[in-house]
Every structure is written in structure tokens, then in C-alpha cells.
């Protein structure tokens, strides 16, 4: 219940506007303006599509300090004008109080108590930055670097890992495990040789081809900063870059592995020059190293401009927790409007962990095919999750918050304000009982160095000029086992493709080995090398646990297959949690699991070829199947949102079949054409043929052109499904015997199994922007 407080004089600059009564919103907390003067500093930018009350409820929920109204018998014309300008132009009157701003929001009144305002308190600068993001339908995304986007090694870290693997191999008796570790050892040694040639001569031989270092100028990020020119060798076909953190010190040379599918994620974030996300980096690495790694990831500075780079790349101490508040220091974004992409959740503050989408750690040496064999690479999954989060956030903002805000009046109680959207509501944490999207066991040694070693070795290298200590490497402290999330697209590849996911050795069923010389976190992952400990002289009791295919989770914890990412411009209906989120489904042969075979159900088609539109899935949860055997849950929509009334879903299906076919054609790089032909049937006056790269794959005849299109697209999908099943069935039968005889594990065959999966793309924007 509001209660009368006191009067305050309102000024705009030095101009006196009149007096307003200050009504407290809580009897336990009385707010007073200094000297009982309300000095308006400026008016905020116009909200355009966003009313100020909706913005403030999003970034400062229920932070109403007081209410202002006029009790004067004759209303001040200046105050009435201020109220009218703020109300109709979607602005606020801003009072500066130290590090906070008091925003006067012009309110409608049931009792016509004009002028009247609600006063919100927010950190200085936060309102303007969040207003800009909400107007442009933009959120923030924070990336980790090491083992999330890149893996980097120096000569020293390569030598440590090579010696550790040699020690394990010398104690191993199982020839299969020896072969697996030997293959991993060879990968380390090959890259070490590349790095050594680069350090010694500024060139390297790759498969007999001479690659000379090319000078790359690092543009200064601030005035007065000296230009830096680094010798760089790029091997794009291997996602590998050789660079030097400090060009004058050769021992700061680093071999960097860039995670596959990064380009797809990067292009989604900046598609059509319209920012969907403001990008930040939070890492435990040394700053020069972090800046160079990000330059390799974003060479054109499209994601983070040069003038913003110093503020947006945040380096925290290795023993400290990451925090969104520290990332957004200065009030540039509210944590409720931000999500995180990281391979570890526990390195973040507890309050930020619900906003973290966990990706599997990037392991290019331990499991080199873990990325390429997936139907949907890990970073494409992260892109889909980001798309879902953004779509649901603004869906709730537009259709729930803003519609409710329009019904709020000055006389209403503050505690009755509608809840605001929060990114944490849409980043759904996965069942920890299984690893999603082909996640594999963590390797016994980190792929790159960790923690504060980076800065220590850089400083030592600089002091010794040409010392043997490396400059930098994988600098992230990784204190706990990953906890993946279910906001993923299923990788329902054939068993032959799934086999290619594994390292080239069988997994161990033994317990975790003791790894002398490493420190461990609660989750069992090695954190970093202890200073002064040489792992080459340590006694390693056991070889590493090798990777195995993740076990299929219980049916109760699994979502039904199908669905697709929410197109962020579709603005789908929010059902309480994001749809289109799936666990991984790799076949296995352990007792009690589903049998291994080419297809246990027709719906086990590749999800990126056919997937379900979000609205149709909610209205048809039973997963009705078409006559051709394609589950409607697997049809993908790349266009507008579809609505169906009860059983009358024909209109939605028409667009669904056509858009699914176009999606398949786009992913295959094939042209899909609908050609109208003359019908010889008097009743069915329209006839449409579907051509797939010139080949006719379907025909439809109906009384209307729309129905003919639908029928033709549906028949074409059936034809493609039959061809697909006929193609993958022999491949699946070849591997059917192996998993049953080997306790459900799939081994990599001696021949390379090519991944013929269709490349995942960012959601196509073919409708009007949000």
C-alpha cells in the first residue's frame, strides 16, 4: 500500500518545473531525493518499440524506489508537458545520483492523477545500452577460449604430453590400447615437428609442401599503441595456425587448433550485417595471448570492433571465478540478457551457471574425429541453442511482458508487475546422467596447458629472450567435469558414421588412472602442471581411459526425436521451456539398450535432412507419421511460423512439406524446382512436378495449385526417404555385428569412414525481422 511521504521540487537543469508528492512504495524503506530536489539531468533516448516500463522491469525488476504525483489544485504546465513527452515518446526523465540513475517513468492513471511517475533505480549507463539492445533485438554472448573455441600448444607442452604418452605406452600390455595411444602420440609429434620448423626457420613443411610464414599486421586497439607484425602460417584445411605471441621471442610460438564449425557460428552472429548478439570473451589466459587467439578467430573484427576489444576481452585470475558482472563492468549489459558458451560450468559464479551452455571440450589430439564425424558439430549446436534462446527471450518480451505492461497503471502495486524474461529460463541444463551430442570421456591429459602457466611462461620467455619455456597455450583452468545441456540437435547418423567419432583405439573399462604431477579438481580433471614437476620422470601406473560412445539415456529422460532449432525471426510460442532440444542418440548394444540396426523406426532419419516445425510439434505430440515413412516430427521449417486449428493442419503441413524439401536441397547444394504442368484430369486441374537437380522425384495433382504443391512436396520427401534408407542400410549392416560382439562399443575401422552428413547452416531469414 502506497503511503504519502513528502513533497519535492522538480528541476530540469536550472528550470523549476513544479512540486510533486513522493509516495513510498514500502513502509520499511523510505526514499528521499537529496535536499528534496528532483534534478532531471536529461531525457533518455526514445524507446522506439519498447516502452520504458518494460525495459526497466527487464533490467531492474521491481526496483521502484517511489512514486510521484501532483496534489496541487492547479497542475503545473511544465510538469504536464514533461509527462506528455515521456509518455508519448517512450522516454524517461533521468536523475543522476552518484553511480546510479533514477528513471522517472510517465504512467497512465485510472484516477487521472496527472502528472504521475514511477521512479526506477538502475546502475549508471545500463538503461541506454540495454535499450539499444532491446530495440535491435540483440542479446549478449560470452565465449570462453581454451578447449571451447581453440586448443593451443607450445614446444614445452608438446614435449610434456609426448613423454607422458610414451610412459603409458611402455607400461601397457593391451595391443589395441597401445595402437590407440600410438596414434595419439603420432598426432602430437607431427604437430610438434611443424612448430619446431616454424620456430627455427619461420617456415614449415606440410605433406611435402613448403609453407612460409606471412607477416600479419596486428592493428592497434588504442591510440598510441605500437603496431605489431607477427609471422603467421595458416593451414585452413587443418584448422591450424602457427603464430608468435611476442614476435621478437621465438619461444613464444604457438600452434593453434581452431575448432571446426567456428565459421558457421561466426557468420550466424553477424548475418546480413545485423548483430544478433553482442560478443564478449572471458578467459583465464594471459591478455596478450587472449588478444591474439581472438584475432585468429575474428580477423576482420566483425564480432568485436577494435575500439571495443580491450573492454570486451576480459581476463580473470586462474584461481578466481568468472562472473558476468565482471564481464559487463561499467553497466554495458544486464546478466539476464546474456548467455555463455563454455566447456566448463563450475568456473562461473553460481548465479551465472544457469546461463551457461556447456559444449564438450575440444580434443583434436585425443579424439580428432569427434568433431567431423558428428552430423551437427558442437559449435553448430551452440549456434542453434543461441538461436533458440534469442527467439524465446524476445517472444516472451513481446507477447508476455509488453502486453502485460500496457495494462499497468500508476495506482497498481509494484509487486504485481509481470515477470521479465531471463536467458537462464531458456538455457536448459541436461540430465547429468548422460553426455549429449557425442560427448566423450575427458582425456587423461589436457590438450593444452592450463591456468596461470601462460603468463608465467611468457614472462620467463621474455626474461630469458630465447629460453626453452613456452609462451602460452591452453590457458583455461578446467576444474570440473563438463555438464552438457540438452539444447542440442540429435546426431542420428548411421552406425558407420558413429564409428568414425571414436579415437583409433578401443576404450578402457578400467577406472581413472593416477596421473602423477597433475593437480585435480573435484570433478577429476587435471587442472595444471605443478610448478617444478617434470612428468617425464614420474611413474604413471595406468594408461589413459580411452573414449567410448555415450550410452543412450533412459527413455524417461529423452525427448522424442525430431524438431529443429527455433528460427530466431520466427518468434515461436514459448511453451515454458525451449523445444527443438534433443539428446544424442547413438546406437549401442549394452544390455537393456535398444538394438543396433540400420533403423529401429522410420523416424531415425538424419535430423538435418528432415526435422519438425516447432508449432506443429506442439500441436501434434504423438508424432504422426506420413505414408512414406517420414515422421512429421522430422520435417524442418525454414520460414514463417505456422498455425493450425485443431485437426485442420493441412495449411500448416503444406508449407511444412515445401520448406522441408527446400531445406534439404539447400543443405545438399542441390536445386529444388516446382514446375507446373498441364493436367489431363478434368477434376484435378492442377499438376505440379518436383525436380531435384533436374531429376523428377515427385508429382502432385489436386483441385488447387496449393494442394498440388503440397502433394508434390510430400511425394518428393517420400522418394528421398526411400533413397536415403536404401543408401545407409548397407553401411549400417556392416557395423551391426561389431557392437553386439564388443559389448556395445563401436571401433574405428581401418578405412576412413567419410561423414556424408549435411552441413548445418544458420537459420535462414526469409521473413521480416523481429
UniProtKB/Swiss-Prot annotation:
It comes from Arabidopsis thaliana (Mouse-ear cress). Disruption phenotype: The mutant cpl2-2 exhibits multiple developmental defects, such as a dwarfed size, early flowering, small leaves and poor fertility. Increased salt (NaCl) sensitivity. Produces shorter hypocotyls than wild-type plants in the light, but not in the dark. Enhanced accumulation of intronic heterochromatin (HC)-containing genes functional full-length transcripts (e.g. This is RNA polymerase II C-terminal domain phosphatase-like 2. Keywords: Activator, Auxin signaling pathway, Cytoplasm, Developmental protein, Hydrolase, Metal-binding, Nucleus, RNA-binding, Transcription, Transcription regulation. It comes from the Eukaryota. Residues 134-385 form the FCP1 homology domain. One of its GO terms (molecular function) is protein serine/threonine phosphatase activity. Residues 753-770 have a biased composition (Basic and acidic residues). Binds Mg(2+), Co(2+) or Mn(2+). One of its GO terms (biological process) is auxin-activated signaling pathway.
Amino acid at each position: 500500500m502506497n503511503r504519502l511521504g513528502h513533497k519535492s521540487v522538480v528541476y530540469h537543469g536550472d528550470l523549476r518545473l513544479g512540486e510533486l508528492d513522493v509516495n513510498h512504495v514500502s513502509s520499511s524503506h523510505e526514499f528521499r531525493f537529496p535536499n528534496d530536489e528532483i534534478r532531471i539531468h536529461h531525457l533518455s533516448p526514445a524507446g522506439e518499440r519498447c516502452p520504458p516500463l518494460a525495459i526497466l522491469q527487464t533490467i531492474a525488476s521491481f526496483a521502484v524506489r517511489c512514486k510521484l504525483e501532483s496534489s496541487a489544485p492547479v497542475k503545473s504546465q511544465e510538469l504536464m508537458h514533461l509527462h506528455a513527452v515521456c509518455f508519448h515518446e517512450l522516454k524517461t526523465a533521468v536523475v543522476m545520483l552518484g553511480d546510479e540513475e533514477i528513471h522517472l517513468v510517465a504512467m497512465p492513471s485510472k484516477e487521472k492523477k496527472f502528472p504521475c511517475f514511477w521512479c526506477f533505480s538502475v546502475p549508471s549507463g545500463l538503461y541506454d545500452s540495454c535499450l539499444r539492445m532491446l530495440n535491435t533485438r540483440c542479446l549478449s554472448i560470452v565465449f570462453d577460449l581454451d578447449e571451447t573455441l581453440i586448443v593451443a600448444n607450445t614446444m614445452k607442452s608438446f614435449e610434456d604430453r609426448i613423454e607422458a604418452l610414451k610412459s603409458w605406452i611402455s607400461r601397457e600390455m593391451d595391443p589395441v590400447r597401445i595402437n590407440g595411444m600410438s596414434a595419439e602420440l603420432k598426432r602430437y609429434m607431427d604437430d610438434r615437428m611443424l612448430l619446431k620448423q616454424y620456430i627455427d626457420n619461420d617456415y614449415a613443411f606440410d605433406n611435402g609442401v613448403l609453407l612460409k610464414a606471412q607477416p600479419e599486421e596486428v592493428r592497434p586497439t588504442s591510440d598510441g599503441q605500437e603496431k605489431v607484425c607477427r609471422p603467421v602460417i595458416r593451414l585452413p584445411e587443418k584448422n591450424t595456425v602457427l603464430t608468435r605471441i611476442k614476435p621478437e621471442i621465438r619461444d613464444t610460438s604457438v600452434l593453434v587448433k581452431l575448432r571446426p564449425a567456428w565459421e558457421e557460428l561466426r557468420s550466424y552472429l553477424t548475418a546480413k550485417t545485423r548483430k544478433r548478439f553482442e560478443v564478449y570473451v572471458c578467459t583465464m589466459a594471459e591478455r596478450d595471448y587472449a588478444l591474439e587467439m581472438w584475432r585468429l578467430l575474428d580477423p576482420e573484427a566483425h564480432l568485436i570492433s577494435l575500439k571495443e576489444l580491450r573492454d570486451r576481452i576480459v581476463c580473470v585470475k586462474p584461481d578466481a571465478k568468472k562472473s558476468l558482472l565482471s564481464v559487463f563492468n561499467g553497466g554495458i549489459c544486464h546478466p539476464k540478457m546474456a548467455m555463455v558458451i563454455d566447456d566448463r560450468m563450475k568456473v562461473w559464479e553460481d548465479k551465472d551457471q544457469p546461463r551457461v551452455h556447456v559444449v564438450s571440450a575440444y580434443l583434436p589430439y585425443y579424439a580428432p574425429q569427434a568433431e567431423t564425424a558428428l552430423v551437427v558439430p558442437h559449435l553448430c549446436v551452440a549456434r542453434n541453442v543461441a538461436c533458440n534462446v534469442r527467439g524465446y527471450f524476445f517472444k516472451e518480451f513481446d507477447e508476455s511482458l509488453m502486453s502485460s505492461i500496457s495494462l499497468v497503471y500508476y495506482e497498481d502495486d509494484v509487486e504485481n508487475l509481470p515477470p521479465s524474461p531471463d536467458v537462464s529460463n531458456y538455457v536448459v541444463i541436461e540430465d547429468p546422467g548422460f553426455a549429449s551430442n557425442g560427448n566423450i570421456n575427458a582425456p587423461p591429459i589436457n590438450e593444452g596447458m592450463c591456468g596461470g602457466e601462460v603468463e608465467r611462461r611468457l614472462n620467463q620467455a621474455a626474461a630469458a629472450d630465447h629460453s626453452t619455456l613456452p609462451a602460452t597455450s591452453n590457458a583455461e583452468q578446467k576444474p570440473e567435469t563438463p555438464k552438457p545441456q540438452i539444447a542440442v540437435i540429435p546426431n542420428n547418423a548411421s552406425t558407420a558414421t558413429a564409428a568414425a567419432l571414436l579415437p583409433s583405439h578401443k576404450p578402457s573399462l578400467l577406472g581413472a588412472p593416477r596421473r602423477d604431477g597433475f593437480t585435480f579438481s573435484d570433478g577429476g580433471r587435471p587442472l595444471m602442471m605443478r610448478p617444478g614437476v617434470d612428468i617425464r620422470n614420474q611413474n604413471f601406473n595406468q594408461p589413459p581411459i580411452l573414449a567410448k560412445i555415450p550410452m543412450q539415456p533412459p527413455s524417461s529422460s529423452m525427448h522424442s526425436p525430431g524438431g529443429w532449432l527455433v528460427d530466431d525471426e520466427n518468434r515461436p510460442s514459448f511453451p515454458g521451456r525451449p523445444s527443438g532440444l534433443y539428446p544424442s542418440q547413438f546406437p549401442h548394444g549394452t544390455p537393456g539398450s535398444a538394438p543396433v540396426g540400420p533403423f529401429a523406426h522410420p523416424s531415425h532419419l538424419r535430423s538435418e535432412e528432415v526435422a519438425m516445425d516447432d508449432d506443429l510439434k506442439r500441436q501434434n505430440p504423438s508424432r504422426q507419421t506420413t505414408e512414406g515413412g517420414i515422421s512429421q516430427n522430422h520435417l524442418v521449417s525454414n520460414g514463417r511460423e505456422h498455425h493450425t486449428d485443431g485437426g485442420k493442419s493441412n495449411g500448416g503441413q503444406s508449407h511444412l512439406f515445401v520448406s522441408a524439401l527446400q531445406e534439404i536441397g539447400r543443405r545438399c547444394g542441390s536445386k529444388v524446382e516446382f514446375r507446373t504442368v498441364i493436367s489431363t484430369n478434368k477434376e484435378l486441374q492442377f499438376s505440379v512436378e518436383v525436380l531435384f537437380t533436374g531429376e523428377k522425384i515427385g508429382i502432385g495433382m489436386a483441385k488447387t495449385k496449393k494442394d498440388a504443391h503440397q502433394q508434390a512436396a510430400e511425394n518428393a520427401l517420400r522418394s528421398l526417404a526411400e533413397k536415403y534408407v536404401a543408401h545407409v542400410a548397407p553401411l549400417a549392416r556392416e557395423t551391426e555385428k561389431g557392437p553386439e560382439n564388443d559389448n556395445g562399443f563401436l571401433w574405428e575401422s581401418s578405412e576412413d569412414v567419410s561423414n556424408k552428413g549435411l552441413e548445418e547452416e544458420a537459420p535462414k531469414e526469409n521473413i521480416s525481422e523481429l
